[in-house]
UniProtKB/Swiss-Prot annotation:
GO aspect biological process, one term: entry receptor-mediated virion attachment to host cell
Gene coding for it: III
Protein's recorded name: Attachment protein G3P
Topological type in the membrane: Single-pass type I membrane protein
Region: G1 (Gly-rich linker), residue numbers: 89-107
Keyword Transmembrane tagged: yes
Native species: Salmonella phage IKe
Amino acid sequence: MKRKIIAISLFLYIPLSNADNWESITKSYYTGFAISKTVESKDKDGKPVRKEVITQADLTTACNDAKASAQNVFNQIKLTLSGTWPNSQFRLVTGDTCVYNGSPGEKTESWSIRAQVEGDIQRSVPDEEPSEQTPEEICEAKPPIDGVFNNVFKGDEGGFYINYNGCEYEATGVTVCQNDGTVCSSSAWKPTGYVPESGEPSSSPLKDGDTGGTGEGGSDTGGDTGGGDTGGGSTGGDTGGSSGGGSSGGGSSGGSTGKSLTKEDVTAAIHVASPSIGDAVKDSLTEDNDQYDNQKKADEQSAKASASVSDAISDGMRGVGNFVDDFGGESSQYGTGNSEMDLSVSLAKGQLGIDREGHGSAWESFLNDGALRPSIPTGHGCTNFVMYQGSVYQIEIGCDKLNDIKSVLSWVMYCLTFWYVFQSVTSLLRKGEQ
């Protein structure tokens, strides 16, 4: 039986020892409380004495309660965590001891001690093994190459491509090609990450001295001596000098009809590429200067805004002046014209019957405290205000002074009330616009 227990222990230990790495998800402090218990005893005189006591055992119980609280929280959120990390395992790690804010003891009144323990909820993180690279990733990671290659083909967007060592390369940098575009030299052939399918032609670099390809009728020996599509075969290469094939296959005619890069090819390629290279250099060193256009547009907008503000101020001032001017019309001191204020005044006078001379008009209400005075209560008379009557320090304030003070205070309260109402209305209007 003992051996079975040991075997089971080893079986459980091995997976845990080889477990994945663990990372913390959340850390929190969990709390338990030790509440004092009432203990009754008697003093020396035999009188009953009550004490509130907390022992070390109570602190241990409070610590266990804090750990149980952490376990309850872990059990509640474990299902949610499993949905977030379905391939992970979860565990709760708590401290061995708790932190208390007091010590065991006794007091005359009820009291408590708080026990706190830190709980760390963790999840397993599997060791990620590097996956094998795909053929596309292998091709894309290869470094650029340079040189002259045959079997070059042109892409849909006009670029030149080769299939070399099982990967596709694109010609970048300075590129020079023959007239037919099947042989090109580039300063940088960069891999595109594309893997050619079986059956697609592959390219090979042309070494120094190679002036031809392996076209029809040509061979390796024909290429070495100038053969090509029409170059000599086995006798037009190394044996061309003795059999006469060299003069017609690899000799004078082989160079002109083969796949070599001639002086004319290089000159033509440079001539074609020069404008684009010049434009690219110019674009990289310069940029369009639109500062003048932007400044002109900004000046025009500023002028329009200034004119609009000036006209609005002028119309407003003229309208206010015409409203308070006794003469108006052609004899007005503020100029003539139908401003927005003038139209508003005409509407107020003609349709609403509001005149600045009338009782309760807007103009008089804002500036004259007597406009609304008839509606304000005036009281039931006035008597002199007397302090310390009959003494040497008697102070007496007459009704005339009291009336003046009352008038001033009522005017102040009226202004404050109007200002409060005005602020409230404008604040509501601003909020409505937003």
